[in-house]
Amino acid sequence: MNRAGILLEKEPGLKTIFQGSEHSYVRCVIADMADPERHFVCRVLDEEDLPVAVGEPITLEVIKVVTERRSGIVRFDCRLIKKPE
């Protein structure tokens, strides 16, 4: 499954444990292309920073969906789909 949208914010240089090993990631929020009022919170794994500026389109491959029980917030663990040069 892919998520495409406009990058609203990003927080680079973070670290997490994912599937038993440490990974760098970028926390970001994207606005859905079809419905810009819908925002998605994503962790883009294995990236120190994104080569996409805030306000530009981005496409991510979702590898895991996580729902935080207490808050009910859904977060997507993703990988960046790189554009061919």
Regions found by a protein language model. Name each.
Residues 1-22:
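Structural detector for short beta-strands of small beta-barrel domains
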Residues 2, 25-27, 57:
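Broad gene-expression machinery/nucleic-acid interaction feature
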Residues 2-4, 39-41, 77:
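Well-ordered beta-strand positions in beta-sheet-rich domains
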Residues 5-9, 55-65:
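OB-fold and OB-like beta-barrel modules that bind single-stranded nucleic acids
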Residues 24-29, 72-76:
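Short beta-strand micro-motifs in enzyme catalytic cores
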Residues 29-52:
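Beta-strand/loop nucleic-acid-binding surfaces
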Residues 31, 45, 61-63, 81:
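A structural detector for beta-sheet-dominated domains
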Residues 63-85:
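OB-fold/S1-family single-stranded nucleic acid-binding modules
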